[in-house]
Amino acid sequence: MTIITPITNDPTTALLRLMAWLSPVFPVGSFSYSHGLERAVHDGLVVDAAGLQDWLQWLVRRGSGWNDAVLCAESWRCTMKGEDLHEIAELAEALAGSRERHMETMLQGGAFLAAARSWPCEIFDRLPPDCAYPVAVGAVAGGHGVPLAQALAAFLQAFCINLLQASIRLSVTGQSGVTAIMAALEPVLGETAARAALSSMEDLGSATFIADIMAMKHETQHSRLFRS
């Protein structure tokens, strides 16, 4: 029996779906990725809560977090307009700057689509079988009528929370430090989500070169906790 999940115009339903899809327990395997943070800690570039907060805010504002938010927004818009999603999916995959970043976004994207099928939607038939994570999230959010700004804010927060969880395992900070950083990042997440909601493909671009290099160097790190 096929269960059809209706497109929502109810803000509470939209919130519940975002909280489910972007929860740390949603089965995308996010806990196994550090996005290069493990190497940054290893090399002494991130050693405390202040450095971690700075690292995260620039990833969100000017780094891979920003690019992913732009891709997520474009995927959402293509979905709402009924446009083809293959081109944006190919671009998102091509923008992965290293082998482990590529693995991180593609495996999470595939796992997200598989798990999100518990909320049936026609968008799954329009997506390529291999899909980068931000494109998958944007398309599913758009397919269910979840407002763009809220989807982007939740997506960016989930990105940061995953790295904050990694920071605890890497002994950069503890739970009290993580909650303080979460609170401090709220304005950054809100402002970046608002910018991304108004973005176009011309706004793609990042300037967090050290973070990108750390992601590359992690590929040759022998002792590790994370896959990226």
From Swiss-Prot:
Matches recorded under InterPro entries: UreF (IPR002639), UreF_sf (IPR038277)
Any GO MF annotation of the entry: nickel cation binding
Top-level lineage group: Bacteria
Pfam family, one: UreF
Function: Required for maturation of urease via the functional incorporation of the urease nickel metallocenter.
Subunit structure: UreD, UreF and UreG form a complex that acts as a GTP-hydrolysis-dependent molecular chaperone, activating the urease apoprotein by helping to assemble the nickel containing metallocenter of UreC. The UreE protein probably delivers the nickel.
Descriptive protein name: Urease accessory protein UreF 2
Cellular component GO terms held in the UniProt record: cytoplasm
Family, as annotated: Belongs to the UreF family.
Keywords, sorted A to Z: Chaperone, Cytoplasm, Nickel insertion
HAMAP family, per the entry: UreF (MF_01385)
Chief location of this protein within or outside the cell: cytoplasm
UniProt subcellular location: Cytoplasm
